[in-house]
């Protein structure tokens, strides 16, 4: 039988794994995904037949395969799509080699590596079994142990790869980052594009809409129970996601479809804001409509601010083209695993390998399981998040940092996060020659910090320092003078921190916000006075005001009655055993609002401006494993919602105490710590 007539062999991926590990993993440092291994086994079985294991040409093929894979920069993970592309490239190169070489030389080209040779074609023609079934001891070759440092990465906002959401195809599409001869665009002063501004709201809207439609309450568009569905939806969320009755399914109507349907009930999804006349309106990509919230009952436990995307239920009135809202709520949240499954486990952050035009990185399920088990083993890893406003120009702060470093030096954490602002007054340009400028003083403060750190050998050598800028830090402070500026915020310029860089072995000057990829977890860190902003811009509903007024009057009456009865027991003074402290209720409102909106700044541009080109870096799709919102204006909290642990370490110095939070990734447990200064 000639070489082209060899029968293919069916190879089990598990039989090929030891050989592929020796060549691809051990020699070239590649990780083989399960689908990639199956595709590779199928190709080798068709090309080399039953003697694929004893043939030296199989090894040569894997060597060529690995070389082309690295040549094309396809990343560390070998998947099925990449295997198909590389094998096709091998065939194309073989054709080119055939055309350029004489006939005799062609026998030694790559064609011999993708077809059975005459040596084992004879075995097949003699009646050999075409299925490789010989057992192989897999214990002889074990999986390569994972190094946790390969899966630990601090991701700067301006270096984060960009995926845009294709509305028509309902999938993410990679956007290639352009670079200039002067350097990456993130380092250049440029004006955001108008296209990014126009796409900002529709992208966010459709992400929320698709998330809502994946909810079980919206799966049946034929049945709709108006004026009660919102209440039942809230009951479902409070009950932990139990399915609704068959009569409670809801459907979303576009605003443009309200015309001519006077007096009917509808459920709308849109962004709430004030229009040019100063009235509240609801907006979606199809249009905008004025809303009447005088009789609206919002669901409790969340903030409603201009810029939030909400579900509003009510009656359309053609008189004045108004929508009278009866109830309003935030879109139902979605767990991280459910979102990743819906988008095909895309590696949006490029943690397991950067994506490019010819290769899209995905999260391998087997690898995620291995990383999860590795997390459980690394029980000594700790992340320490300090409170915000570490004012280095304050002598009390230097004393507090010294006491903190004394404690951490005995057992250095894996990561130490220091949120700004790092000066009590904003940095501004000064031309006064009689006194040092604010920039010189700012540099001197970091030089003093470097001098302090030099006393702690273990800390500066074993810990990764992550600095997050605040409102008073350069260069944004020069334009906004300490007022909250545009998001995201650039890292602190390197000219101010040269001595800290020399002292610390591992230091990262992060943006605001910054993401940390740690094994199977994703952490989002942001420094923002979000609590005060929510309170200042919260929408006032007349029905809620009336309820609060009645509760206040009732409380006053009860207090007067209590004064008359001096022998009341403590159980009679407690109105509800389920009543939570105000700080707990406040923290839950903040966390639920942010995670339901799946955006770190769910405000309009008038409230908190955003750099249009980088709005995608503020999206929480999927929600992170852990979210750290450093907000000195809010109470310290540790809240878990939809599987996302949310932490606020509070203010760094409060009543002569140093505040910080210690997070253990192996247990996903946070502990609040204090040190008296």
From Swiss-Prot:
GO terms for molecular function: DNA polymerase processivity factor activity; DNA-directed DNA polymerase activity; double-stranded DNA binding; single-stranded DNA binding. InterPro entries: DNA_pol_a/d/e_bsu, POLE2. It is found in: Nucleus. GO terms for cellular component: cytoplasm; epsilon DNA polymerase complex; nuclear replication fork. It comes from the Eukaryota. The keyword Cell inner membrane does not apply. Its main location: nucleus. Keywords: DNA replication, DNA-binding, Nucleus. One of its GO terms (biological process) is DNA-templated DNA replication maintenance of fidelity. In eukaryotes there are five DNA polymerases: alpha, beta, gamma, delta, and epsilon which are responsible for different reactions of DNA synthesis. Belongs to the DNA polymerase epsilon subunit B family. Heterotetramer. Consists of four subunits: POL2, DPB2, DPB3 and DPB4. As accessory component of the DNA polymerase epsilon (DNA polymerase II) participates in chromosomal DNA replication. This is DNA polymerase epsilon subunit B. It comes from Eremothecium gossypii (strain ATCC 10895 / CBS 109.51 / FGSC 9923 / NRRL Y-1056).
């Amino acid at each position: 039988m000639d070489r082209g007539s060899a029968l293919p062999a069916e190879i089990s991926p598990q039989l090929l794994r030891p050989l592929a590990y020796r060549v691809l993993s051990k020699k070239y440092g590649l990780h083989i995904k399960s689908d990639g291994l199956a595709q590779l086994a199928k190709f080798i079985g068709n090309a080399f037949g039953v003697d694929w294991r004893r043939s030296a040409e199989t090894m040569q093929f894997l060597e060529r395969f690995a070389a082309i894979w690295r040549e094309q920069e396809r990343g560390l993970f070998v998947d099925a799509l990449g295997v198909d592309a590389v094998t096709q490239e091998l065939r194309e190169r073989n054709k080119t080699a055939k055309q350029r070489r004489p006939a005799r030389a062609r026998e030694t080209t790559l064609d011999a590596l993708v077809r059975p040779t005459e040596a084992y074609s004879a075995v097949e023609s003699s009646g050999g079994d075409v299925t490789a079934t010989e057992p192989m001891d897999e214990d002889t070759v074990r999986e390569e142990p994972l190094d946790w440092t390969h899966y630990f990465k601090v991701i700067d906002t301006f270096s984060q790869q960009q995926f845009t959401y294709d509305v028509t195809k309902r999938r993410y599409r990679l956007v290639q980052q352009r670079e200039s001869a002067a350097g990456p665009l993130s380092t250049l002063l440029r004006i955001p594009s108008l296209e990014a501004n126009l796409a900002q709201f529709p992208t966010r809207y459709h992400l929320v809409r698709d998330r809502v439609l994946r909810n079980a309450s919206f799966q049946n568009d034929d049945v709709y129970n108006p004026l009660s569905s919102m209440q039942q939806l809230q009951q479902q969320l409070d009950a932990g996601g139990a399915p609704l009755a068959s009569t409670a399914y809801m459907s979303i109507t576009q605003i443009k479809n309200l015309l001519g349907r006077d007096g009917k009930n509808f459920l709308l999804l849109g962004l709430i804001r004030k229009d040019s006349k100063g009235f509240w309106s609801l907006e979606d990509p199809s249009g905008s409509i004025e809303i009447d919230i005088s009789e609206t009952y919002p669901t409790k436990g969340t903030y409603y601010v201009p810029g939030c995307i909400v579900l509003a239920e009510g009656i359309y009135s053609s008189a004045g083209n108004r929508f009278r809202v009866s109830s309003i709520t935030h879109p139902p949240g979605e767990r991280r695993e459910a979102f990743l499954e819906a988008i095909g486990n895309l590696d949006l952050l490029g943690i397991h390998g950067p994506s490019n035009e010819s290769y899209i990185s995905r999260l391998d399920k087997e690898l995620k399981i291995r990383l999860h088990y590795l997390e459980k083993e690394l029980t000594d890893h700790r992340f320490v998040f300090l409170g915000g406003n570490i004012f280095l120009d304050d002598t009390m702060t230097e004393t507090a940092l010294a006491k903190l470093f004394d404690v951490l030096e005995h057992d250095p954490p894996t990561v130490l996060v220091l949120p700004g602002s790092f000066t009590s007054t904003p940095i501004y340009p000064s031309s006064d020659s009689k006194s040092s400028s604010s920039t010189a003083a700012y540099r001197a403060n970091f030089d003093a910090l470097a001098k302090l750190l030099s006393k702690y050998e273990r800390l500066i050598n074993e810990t990764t320092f992550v600095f997050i800028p605040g409102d008073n830090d350069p260069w944004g402070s020069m334009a906004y003078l300490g007022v909250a500026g545009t998001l995201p915020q650039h890292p602190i310029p390197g000219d101010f921190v040269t001595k800290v860089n020399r002292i610390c072995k591992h230091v990262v000057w992060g943006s605001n916000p910054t993401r940390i990829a740690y094994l199977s977890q994703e952490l989002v860190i942001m420094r923002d006075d979000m609590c005060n902003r929510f309170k200042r811009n919260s929408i006032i509903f007349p029905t809620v005001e009336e309820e609060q007024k009645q509760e206040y009057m009732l409380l006053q009456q009860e207090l007067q009655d209590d004064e008359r009865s001096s022998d009341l027991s403590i159980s009679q003074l407690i109105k509800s055993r389920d009543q939570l402290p105000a700080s707990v209720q406040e923290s839950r409102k903040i966390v639920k609002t942010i995670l339901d909106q799946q955006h770190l700044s769910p405000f309009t541009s008038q409230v908190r401006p955003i750099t249009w080109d980088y709005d995608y870096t503020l999206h929480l799709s999927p929600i992170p494993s852990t979210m750290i919102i450093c907000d000195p204006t809010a109470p310290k909290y540790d809240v878990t919602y939809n599987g996302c642990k949310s932490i606020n370490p509070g203010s760094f110095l409060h009543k002569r105490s140093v505040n910080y939070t210690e997070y253990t990734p192996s247990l996903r447990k946070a502990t609040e710590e204090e040190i008296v200064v």
